Amino acid sequence: MKHIPSNVFIGIDVSKDRLDVAVAPSGESMGFTNSEDGIVLLADFIKPRDPALVLFEATGGWEMNAVRHLAAQRLPLVVLNPRQVRDFAKATG
């Protein structure tokens, strides 16, 4: 059976201590600690939503443990350059 693509997109704002998650189009949001346990909970939150894409803004390496864990879960990931994100936001108003 062919997989039907999801229309769910998940953005993750990363800091040293936190992973703040926003889900589109549902508008859900959730926060997790940026720790081994928090990353496991993050994956448990994301997987049932079957996202088309999970997006991280590169944050000086603080995102890498979460990226590695979610990649091992075979989730579709993109790590974005913060400058490109900022330039895109400016361009779209």
Question: In which residue ranges do the predicted regions lie?
Answer:
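Phosphate- and other anionic-substrate recognition elements at nucleic-acid/protein interfaces
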Residues: 1-93
